[in-house]
A protein has these predicted regions:
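An acidic-aromatic pocket/loop used at catalytic or ligand-binding sites
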Residues: 1-19, 85-172
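Terminal, regulation- and interaction-focused segments at domain boundaries
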Residues: 1-8, 39-73
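Compositionally biased P/S/T/G-rich terminal and signal peptide-adjacent segments
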Residues: 8-53, 168-171
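Amphipathic alpha-helical segments
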Residues: 15-24, 62-83
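Short, low-complexity intrinsically disordered segments
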Residues: 27-28, 55, 73, 88, ...
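Short, Lys/Arg-enriched charge-dense amphipathic segments
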Residues: 28-34, 47-62, 102-117
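Surface-exposed patches in mature extracellular/periplasmic domains of secreted proteins
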Residues: 28-33, 80-88
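Short small/polar-residue motifs
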Residues: 39, 76-81, 97-104
Length: 172
């Protein structure tokens, strides 16, 4: 049973993912999938809740097996139950518990990339309302936690306007 709100869970989730990436000597981590996203989940007894999921991607390192061991050791230090699926040469690390519900580190996530992803524990809340709240903040120009480094996606429903740019004043 969690005592965190979904947004507190998001804060812990983002810190967990970013702290995990810091265990590796890899640069270029970014939220390829977008910001932290809320989802519906079950709290038991038919009660619905909400939790966030979040991931970061980076170019693959040169020592996937060593990097998998580093992530596993770090997650164990956080009190997580950890298992390494040793699909040589691209192991995957799975963790449960600790600061998040579950997490995974994939050394072959796609085009020569690493991926660290996690899901926060389910907490009382409404995922749709949270998403609307997050999107309202984004529309107001507020950077929602986890959005740092995301690339805006083209929205065919949105009307884009090109603003005329005033010519620069000549230097002198």
């Amino acid at each position: 049973v969690t005592t965190m709100t979904p947004t507190e869970g998001r804060t812990a989730l983002i810190a967990f993912v970013k702290d995990t990436t810091q265990q590796l000597d890899i640069t270029g981590w970014w939220p390829k999938s977008g910001g932290a996203a809320p989802d519906s989940c079950g709290l038991g007894g038919g009660e619905k809740g909400a939790s966030y999921s979040f991931d970061h991607w980076a170019p693959r390192g040169t020592d996937p097996a060593g990097d998998a061991r580093k992530v596993a050791t770090y997650w164990e230090s956080l009190g997580m139950s950890v298992r390494i699926a040793d699909s040589t040469p691209w192991p995957r690390v799975f963790g449960e518990g600790g600061p998040v519900l579950r997490a995974a580190f994939d050394t072959k996530a796609g085009e020569d990339t690493y991926r660290v992803g996690a899901t926060a524990r389910c907490a009382p809340g409404d995922a749709i309302a949270l998403l609307k709240e997050d999107n309202a903040q984004r529309a107001a120009g507020i950077v929602v936690p986890g959005d740092e480094g995301t690339i805006p996606r083209w929205d065919p429903k949105k009307k884009y306007t090109l603003e005329p740019v005033a010519p620069a004043e000549p230097a002198g």
